[in-house]
Regions:
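Conserved acetyl-CoA-binding loop-helix of GNAT-fold acetyltransferases
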Residues: 102-115, 127
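C-terminal "cap" of GNAT-fold acetyltransferases
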Residues: 148-175
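A short, internal acetyl-CoA/4′-phosphopantetheine-binding micro-motif in the GNAT/acyltransferase core
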Residues: 94-101, 130-131
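Active-site rim helix/loop that mediates acceptor-substrate recognition in acyltransferases
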Residues: 33-69, 157
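Conserved beta-strand in the GNAT
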Residues: 62, 73-83, 87-95
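Short acidic N-proximal helix/loop "leader" segments that mark the beginning
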Residues: 1-14
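A short beta-loop-alpha structural element at the N-terminal edge
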Residues: 13, 18-32
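Conserved active-site alpha-helix within GNAT-family acetyltransferase domains
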Residues: 119, 123, 129-156
Length: 175
């Protein structure tokens, strides 16, 4: 069975399936595109093209649901860490399968990105989001868009909503 919205379909996953977190591979591209597209079609995140996802595939951490009760496994969640400057990276593309909402999987993926940022000795992270309370629970604070690093704006110029952005800027120092 699949969950469908405006021709965007994702496989149904069993919510009790075991979860494994790992870095993305090119073979994961279509599943990532479908999950992000599912939420983008609902207006809850930005669309990401296959070509952009392929360019940035090394940025992403995946949560994979294993087989359970005869149901096939699949992509339960995705989140990326995208380097913007030597002192800043963006947590981006966070999408959780509907069967796994509210189970701590988003936090687990953001933590994986944070751990990678710490390994890289990054002093700070930021995120654009419509989900401010979630990022606050992950230790981020809301900041004014004008306080963001100039490199952020070069990324934003590619966005269809650049002129009318309604996302919230969130920031987290890593200590």
């Amino acid at each position: 069975m699949t969950l469908t919205l405006d021709s965007i379909a994702i496989p149904e996953l069993h919510p009790d399936a075991p979860i494994t977190v790992r870095k993305a591979r090119l073979s994961d591209l279509e599943a990532i595109h479908e999950l992000i597209g599912y939420w983008a079609a609902r207006g809850l995140m930005l669309v990401r093209s296959r070509s952009l996802l392929a360019e940035t595939i090394r940025d992403f951490h995946l949560a994979l649901a294993g087989e359970h009760g005869g149901a096939a496994g699949g992509l339960a969640g995705v989140c990326g860490l995208h380097m913007l400057a030597p002192d800043l990276a963006e947590v981006r593309g966070l999408a959780i399968h509907p069967s796994f909402q509210g189970r701590g999987l988003g936090r687990r993926l953001v933590s994986a990105c944070e751990a990678e940022a710490r390994e890289l000795a990054l002093p700070a992270l930021f995120a654009w989001t419509y989900q401010q309370p979630f990022f606050e629970k992950c230790g981020f604070i809301r900041i004014e868009k004008t306080n963001l690093h100039p490199k952020v704006w070069s990324e934003c110029q590619r966005c269809a909503f650049f002129e009318n952005c309604n996302e919230i800027a969130m920031y987290r120092e890593l200590k």
